[in-house]
Amino acid sequence: MADNNTPGDKKLSVPTKTLTLKPRVETGTVRQSFPHGRSKQVVVEKRGTKRRVGDGAPDAPHAPEPVVAKAPPPPPPSNRPSGPRPGSSQRGGSGVVLRTLTEDERSARASALADARVRDMEERRQAEEEARRRAEREAAERAEREAAEARRKAEEERHRQEEEAKRKAELEAKKRFGEGEAPRPATAAPQQQPAAVTAPARPAQAPGRPQGAPGSRPQQIGTSARPGGAQPAGARPAAARPAGAGPLGRAPGVAAGPEDDEGPRQIRRGPGGAARPAPPPKTTHKPGPQKQRGRLTVVTALTADDVRERSIASFRRRTQRLKGHAANEQKEKLVREVTIPEAITIQELANRMSERAVDVIRLLMRQGAMHKITDVIDADTAQLIAEELGHSVKRVAASDVEEGLFDVVDDSTDTEPRSPVVTVMGHVDHGKTSLLDALRHANVVSGEAGGITQHIGAYQVTAPDSGKKITFIDTPGHAAFTAMRARGAKVTDIVVLVVAADDGVMPQTIEAINHAKAAKVPMIVAINKIDKPDARPDRVRTELLQHEVQVESLGGEVVDVEVSAKNKTNLDRLLEMIALQADILDLKTNSDRPAEGTVIEAKLDRGRGPVATVLVQRGTLRVGDIIVAGAEMGRVRALISDQGETLQEAGPSVPVEVLGFNGPPEAGDRLAVVENEARARQVTSYRAHQKRENAAASISGMRGSLEQMMSQLKTAGRKEFPLVIKADVQGSLEAILGSLEKLGTDEVAARILHAGVGGISESDVTLAEGFNAAIIGFSVRANKEAAALAKRNGIEIRYYNIIYDLVDDVKKAMSGLLAPTLRETMLGNAQILEVFNISKVGKVAGCRVTDGTVERGANVRLIRDNVVVHEGKLSTLKRFKDEVKEVQAGQECGMAFESYGDMRVGDVIECYRVETIQRSL
């Protein structure tokens, strides 16, 4: 900026400002922006303040402010009478002053400061909260460590005490049984050892009685009497035996035999000689009993350690004697309780009775029945045989393996409240899935092909007011999924009937009402789409009266709620009504028991294998449980919730995806947890056997009708459209098969060669090739090998995601097999006036067209006396010797027929055209 002095002005002037020391100032220019797009370049000064001794505290530093270039600065106020102000600055002739803040800037600054203070307080509060949580966490961890250390010390102390007690017990046992410490080496001469160490002192021996006389007291073992009284040098000292040991180291408490009381066997030297103990017998350790080798003498027989055993010949003689006695004795008959199933072989029955199969066959022969041991007899015959042989009978059925799987009565004291299961039903496109999306804050409709629900889905929603969880089951609404809706009604507690306010009651709405009545569950009517201009909720209530559904507003007991899934209107009231209805039902179950549930949907996933959507109804399903559903079994490998989270367990009313089945079960099968794999195999084998028997019975029952059908096919020429169908889930496959079955007529029908769940494989392509069939994949794809094989063999594979498109295409293809319809269109009539015989042409009829027109090449009938005598084509049509295409009424012409010449005067010729009309189903 320029200073205030005008160029060329030479006048001297005294500055009006107070003289101050010029501080060190740093200046710069910036462009200041104002509202409404205005801007201004200003000078910015940066001052440094000094603090002097004796001055008061300097003012709080201010942020640098914009400077006005032209306006002179006002004199700064000073409290001191004289002297320069420490913080003042002097701008020598520049005339630059600081601009005061505007009201908006001041308010903005104040609000910024207030926001900063609020943020500071919030950060300080969060820091304090975090410090408190950290302190609590550290205290909990410290307490846990102390508890773990205390447990460890207690465990170590317990182990130490157990080891000490064990060691003491071992020492005591060693002391008692003479297996304690090793003998100490002798430190003194054996002859200086006292005579009796372990025995009490006895009176002196009577004089004149020789040592070793019959009446003398036997000596101790430790001091054997030798002629001189000396002990051998290598003898074991008496003190080597443990204290408390009896003679020869016998354990205390063991009674000594007569030989022990008299001491060791002694050898007499003579009448007055001293007796010495006999040498100990030699002990030989042999690996086992052996036969006595060499010559058997008295000495060897007495000194042999081996115990004589019975010879083989003697053992055989004894066995023969026992057999002879046993043959003479009358055996006591054993009466057994024989378990008899519905069918059993003769050999198995004899084994269970511990009887010979020959006796059973002999008994049957006396009754006039000839059988072999491999023949199967029924339970009644087996019971008669067992009772005839004196046994008791216990009848069992094959279905007994299912006893105790389901419907076990729980104790009322163990039950607890559970979440309600709500099924949403209604007509197609009435907003069932959209209503669930609004409740779940999700978007499932966009994920469904064509925006329609083709799978049954289960979700959990938490009520905002009460916090209780509600399980919703979404069912398809169109006509093909009747079986799915029936399954949904069976497992539900409450049915929410969704009716569109602009559409009213439709066929699937009526079907849903019937399902709810058959399941005997309460119903809540949700009148949806009330946000539309043509919505008429009162008309819906009136139409429901025709089907015996009377809402509360019309004096009935059925709750009705007007909702809008699009605008999320009255959704809280709908949840409130559901919770109220659940409280009225008082839903309780026992969660501490093996789980029971129902398979809502099942599919075969390529990456995860068989996957079943299961609604747990009772108990708790855990990872690792052995489960049975229908004819399939498995062990739970994983539980996945509707949100995609992996769970370790699922309680009552919780829908989960279960991984671990051997194969995909059928939708609607009941699931149960069994105790072991053996029980699971019994149940599944029985159910598979029942399934095969039912299939065989249905085939055998259809034999007569099948023969009749084959004869009808030969006579009527009924055509078949072969198909191989693979779908993603069992429910969709059922819907497709039901829809295709309805397309069949007396002339054409769909023949399903194979229908299954999973991707299209090479075996499917091979089967389709053998019958020249088409392959249909619904929400599945063919693998690489199957696609290559189909392309190589010319087999068509059609993929669909919407069931309507699949049914329409099959309907068109089957319509192509229908024979077309022939429709006659009358053109005109002519009467023969004269018949001419022309050479090289044949007979030609001269006719007059009475009505309509006659065209060349059209079909004709020759009618004589109201009887058709010929049908053919008109080969020649002339008028005055000219070939013409047609002749109008009232004109005369000449006609000739193809390959026919028997025409007479007065015959009538009908001319008509045949149109071919393609038929459709």
Swiss-Prot record:
Region span, G1: 426-433
Region (G2): 451-455
Record: residues binding GTP: 426-433, 474-478, 528-531
A Pfam family assignment: IF-2
Region of interest: G4: 528-531
Disulfide bonds, paired cysteine numbers: none
Keywords assigned: Cytoplasm, GTP-binding, Initiation factor, Nucleotide-binding, Protein biosynthesis
Ranges of Basic and acidic residues composition bias in the record: 116-182
Domain tr-type G as annotated: residue spans: 417-586
Cellular component GO terms held in the UniProt record: cytosol
SUPFAM superfamilies registered for this protein in UniProt: Initiation factor IF2/eIF5b, domain 3 (SSF52156), P-loop containing nucleoside triphosphate hydrolases (SSF52540), Translation proteins (SSF50447)
Region described as G5: spans on this chain: 564-566
Subcellular location: Cytoplasm
Chain spans, region Disordered: 1-296
Region (G3): 474-477
One GO molecular-function entry: guanosine tetraphosphate binding
DNA repair keyword on record: no
Biased composition (Low complexity): 80-89, 183-257
Its biological purpose: One of the essential components for the initiation of protein synthesis. Protects formylmethionyl-tRNA from spontaneous hydrolysis and promotes its binding to the 30S ribosomal subunits. Also involved in the hydrolysis of GTP during the formation of the 70S ribosomal complex.
NCBIfam families xrefs: IF-2 (TIGR00487), small_GTP (TIGR00231)
Record-stated family: Belongs to the TRAFAC class translation factor GTPase superfamily. Classic translation factor GTPase family. IF-2 subfamily.
Name listed for the protein in its UniProt record: Translation initiation factor IF-2
Organism, as annotated: Bradyrhizobium sp. (strain BTAi1 / ATCC BAA-1182)
Taxonomy of the source species: Bacteria, Pseudomonadati, Pseudomonadota, Alphaproteobacteria, Hyphomicrobiales
Encoding gene (name): infB
